[in-house]
């Protein structure tokens, strides 16, 4: 247990020191364009085409670069953390394919054919996706995902102070 605590503290300090490594890189101009387009989308009868355009033109390539830096090219099963760098709130999740899951989180924040919408998606949409870091906490096989997700939600208390609604493992 103590080793896990020390490992998590070291990882947290490294994340703060190397925050840009774990973020989607967008220029200020791109961020401003996205904000304008999302405001405009709210006035449109059919928002999906514009939101899909924002994904494909502004996020797809930078997302691929970020995911490649963090995960490499292989399909990764494990536990991940999404952190709001403005307020420090976090979300802990699990997936048998983390890259695809992260992509789905971003699309949900953009309100594109979304998975179940959640507090982390609302925050990403309001604060700007570029203000969130994506981190792989642990690789683990499918049969260990629930157990390890519960561990990290309890460790970070993200169901109390973050975006998780439950203690996880479902």
Segment roles from a protein language model:
Residues 1-6:
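N-terminal mitochondrial targeting presequence
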Residues 11-15, 21-44, 49-170:
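Structure-specific nucleic-acid interaction/processing domains
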């Amino acid at each position: 247990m103590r080793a896990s605590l020390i490992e998590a503290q070291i990882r947290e300090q490294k994340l703060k020191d190397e925050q840009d490594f774990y973020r989607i890189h967008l220029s200020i101009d791109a961020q401003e364009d996205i904000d304008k387009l999302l405001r405009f989308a709210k006035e449109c009868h059919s928002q999906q085409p514009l939101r899909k355009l924002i994904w494909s033109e502004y996020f797809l390539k930078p997302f691929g670069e970020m995911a490649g830096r963090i995960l490499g090219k292989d399909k990764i099963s494990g536990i991940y953390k999404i952190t709001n760098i403005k307020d420090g709130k976090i979300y802990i999740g699990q997936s048998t394919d983390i890259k695809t899951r992260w992509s789905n989180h971003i699309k949900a924040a953009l309100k594109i054919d979304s998975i179940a919408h959640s507090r982390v998606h609302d925050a990403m949409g309001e604060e700007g996706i570029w203000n969130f870091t994506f981190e792989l906490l642990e690789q683990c096989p499918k049969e260990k995902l629930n157990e390890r997700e519960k561990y990290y939600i309890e460790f970070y208390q993200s169901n109390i102070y973050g975006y998780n609604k439950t203690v996880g493992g479902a």
